[in-house]
Amino acid sequence: MQFACSLLIDQLVQHLNAFKPDIIATYPSMAVELASQAVLGRLRITPSDLLLGGETLGHESRLAIQNAFTCQIHNQYGASEFLPMAWECAFEHLHANTDWLILEPVDSNYRLVKDGEVPFTTLITNLANYVQPVYRYDIGDQIIFNPEPCKCGSSFPRIEVIGRKDDVIRILDKKGGYVTLLPLTLSTIIEQSGIYDFQIHHHSPNKLTIKLVKKQSNSSSQIQKCISQFKNYLGSMGLAHVHLEIEMVSNLNGGRSGKAKRIFHEEKNGKINSTS
């Protein structure tokens, strides 16, 4: 059974309560919202497994989902060009399926970067598709290869998906250089305050706006914690001069696919740049 991502949350909860699924496959952001509905007592289902993908699953989001649903959580990474590219092991590490594909983390000149380095983007070669070969295709994601062996014993390489290269924020510091802020780091900082519905808007050159959804679960103490932690992080990166605003909104505009678009870049003409 499939349910449209455009459904209102109340409608989705009603459908799920009636259907009582054993397995749910969805985006991490939607799983967090369903977890919130379960904690409130509105969603009354007991799935055995949650299959998550399409977005980066942060540690705080995972905890929120686990606290609401006492079931197995399976994280995966994939794209339209190859699904799935990586599966999660019992130690919550993603392992790339390198017997079926080649992943190349590269710099802006499309040269391979070292293991452990954040690449500019990643190229994919699909070894399984004989109908429409995909060779060194730029998927636009930043993937870090971890050279350390995994406790699970898998020989497949460990990877960490940072996010889209378009989601990286680069801010001018006081010395005239640029400081790079990774989307996964920024999301983790906000989620640590217990807030999961948000967007970060980058206004060049030194202004950021965090948009939060008006809801009862977002208490004033959580919002203040979010602001404090975010400012502390900016200060630690030498960006204490950055102007940070908080904007409360009734809802957030998602991407065309239903994924939770987190980072928006506002161009000088006021147009919002979003790729999801």
Predicted regions and their residues:
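Active-site glycine/GP-rich loop and adjacent strand/helix microenvironment
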Residues: 1-276
